[in-house]
Each structure stands twice: as structure tokens, then as C-alpha cells.
Amino acid sequence: KQVFVIPDPTEREEEPIIFKPNPHRLNAVYYGSHGNLKQIDWGQYDLSKVNLKIISNEGPIFWDFKIQGEFVRQSDLVLLPVNNDHDMTQYKGNNRPIDALRQGRFVITNAMIPSWQLLQNFIWCGDINEGIKYAINNPDEVIKKVEEGQKFVRNNYTPEKITKEWERVYNVCDTWDS
């Protein structure tokens, strides 16, 4: 029998793209579970010109849907480093970068996660330090990537689109012999 993989829908409304960074002091936000957060070696990144806010279920800023939205709106971009060597990393969904794109923000990540690689035309997937430099030096390209990313999310991750995927799966499964 067939196997179906259906992504999570985005829960966020699409917001305007805003990217006018101060190259001397970027505002950035990270959000993720404490389990993800404790796997990150922040010391390997040059964050000397980055005012980073960290949101997780155990703090320092405690996660909640509304809080995350507010901090993303205050940021120039979203930093989402991951530990690519951790066994579970490869199986993560792409809800975190999708959320950022939906809110009109560029994502910088080092993720090699297959679901995140689907977004590589719209987010930075590679060296975090190089991604920060790229964003500062290429604001027009960043805006274009986020515009295209929002279109991709709109076409693939809205509740309406995901509902249609579930209906398709239901209809296929409904034809199987028990």
C-alpha cells in the first residue's frame, strides 16, 4: 500500500515582507524547543553584530504563539541553526522556516534537513556566518527570496491546501479493500 506524507499547515496569516537591516546591528530571533536549543553551539557563530532573542519552551523567552509572532515582527531575520549530526534532525518538519516566511522574514539556517531543503530557494541553507553577510549585502535578493517563499507557502502549506491533500489521501484509502 502507498505511504503518504502530508506536511503541517501554516497557522500564521501572511504578513508584509520587511527587510531594512542596520548592518551594524541586526535584530534576529531564534525559536525552537529546548531540546533543539541545547544542541546548538552558538560559539561557532559570529553574532557580534546581531541582537539575538531566543524563544523556547524553557526560556530565556518563553514560547507562545503570540510571543513568537511579536518577536519575529521586531526582527530583521530569523536564525534557525540546527545540529545536523543529531539522529532525529533529519526527520523534522519545516514548520519553523515556513512560519518565518509567512511572517515576511528571511531565514538563515545550516540545516540539511530534507524538508527544509525544499525551501532552499527561499531561505539561506549553509554557513550561518556567510548567511548573515549575504543578507546584509543583498537586501533586494533577500526580499525577492521571501516573496517567492511566501508564494510557495501559499501554494503548498495553507490549511486549505493541506485539507485537499488529506481529502485526496482519504479518497485513495477509501478505495482499498479491507
Q: Where are the language model's segments positioned?
A:
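A charged, aromatic-enriched C-terminal amphipathic alpha-helix characteristic of glycosyltransferases
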Residues: 13, 139-177
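Nucleotide-sugar-dependent
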Residues: 65-102, 108-118
